[in-house]
């Protein structure tokens, strides 16, 4: 883009007219596809704007001096505390971006705040100012998939448990309370699983710079004091996290402001940490937290990439549909930070990683407590294929109650784990964790395998082959009601009822879609029966070149 010029002397504020000087006209205008691809490989972007002087409030905000490897999610996160981000344009070749807020008031609050507090991404200060354009308008080209998937993920967050719609008010309140403490007092109730200092740091860092943490036990409760760099971050974290669960249905956060205004940390170890003083001694008198917690919970250790994530979790505790916060590198942490499944699905659709999404880099799942007499690679391929494109499946030769399932990426693995863990398959509740393996190895030529390892990398049954596939918008947890599609006109309701009851299941209800008889809902006697029916009948040949498509439904009959 010829109109984008190198940054000039610090302290001189530039209007965005300089960025688009070669392609701006009065009224609506278009960035040329050549200039856009030169900057970021994106297709042409359309804008509607008018001539405005630099610094005049606008919903569109110009961000400069971004790190080279910055992600869409990180850029969007700059605007989250102030309101809803409605559009995004990345110019990675120029280390710049434009974001559009839902209101001018939100944008104004954001610019005012970052004028007094310089934002930092990946250790690098960045610069924020108003754009002279009233709105961003992007097209629907394939190259926009990542940005749009990121926005969809964030919008799912904002409409979900975090209630970030109130965050602009939170920022205003925090800025108005100059005397408010930046220190939070955190109590973790219903402590079924270990909560470590690093777990708290991962969660609370989403809302600002964490300076210090001290953990302790008081009145038989695990507690912590956490100091942010500023009161605004503390206010945002309190509003967003108070009452949330770290893990499924347990480890509930209760958060209040501390009377302290600063923490004095003497040691950097598993109980306390000063992130501004890496030179502090460790104080070897205390045993490491992961060892003591593992002993307290009586659970076996699990190999983990994180030294603070070694404690095992009780294997029988699994409530798959309860939302929790995600903890990277901690096995058993299911749902992401109060992010509904739609957010993870949107991320998977765009092949992006949401900051804070558990296991974003690990695509291999360890599935245990399988029925060794009935489980097959094909049954696992079909079931896990509801939540992503399964690449390989290996049932362990000497431990056939265990299997490895490799998904296309870490987001899909997260979706499968959060939806399927604890559900019954062949009469047994399966348990799912992230595997320590990065991929599933195929057997060597001549090696005895008994057909227990299968490669599905090129399977025609993959549901999500296209980036941004609409199938990601229709992912739901296992339920007794199944959604059927691709039904030929010659197949009747009775035909389908007979088909779905042929393997011993009970059909409790059925109805065709009024406007489209190619689709129907069928209700089985239980969730377990529906799971088995999906495995048995997805891709079933109904004749007339129609293969039945089966998925879980959010609706009931």
Curated annotation (Swiss-Prot):
Q: Which residues carry this modification: Phosphothreonine?
A: 138
Locate the cross-link: Glycyl lysine isopeptide (Lys-Gly) (interchain with G-Cter in SUMO2). 65, 218
Provide the GO biological process annotations. IRES-dependent viral translational initiation; mRNA processing; negative regulation of mRNA splicing, via spliceosome; negative regulation of muscle cell differentiation; negative regulation of neuron differentiation; negative regulation of RNA splicing; neurogenesis; positive regulation of calcineurin-NFAT signaling cascade
Nucleotidyltransferase in keyword set? no
Compartment(s) of residence = Nucleus
Q: What CDD domains does the record point to?
A: RRM1_PTBP1, RRM2_PTBP1, RRM3_PTBP1, RRM4_PTBP1
Its keywords, alphabetically, are: Acetylation, Activator, Isopeptide bond, mRNA processing, mRNA splicing, Nucleus, Phosphoprotein, Repeat, Repressor, RNA-binding, Ubl conjugation
Question: Does the keyword Ubl conjugation feature in the UniProt annotation?
Answer: yes
Which positions fall inside the RRM domain?
59-143, 184-260, 363-437, 480-555
Note the Gene3D superfamilies from the entry: 3.30.70.330
Q: Which residues carry this modification: Phosphotyrosine?
A: 127
> What is this protein called in UniProt?
Polypyrimidine tract-binding protein 1
Q: Can you name the source organism?
A: Homo sapiens
Which classification does the entry list for the species? Eukaryota, Metazoa, Chordata, Craniata, Vertebrata
GN (gene name): PTBP1
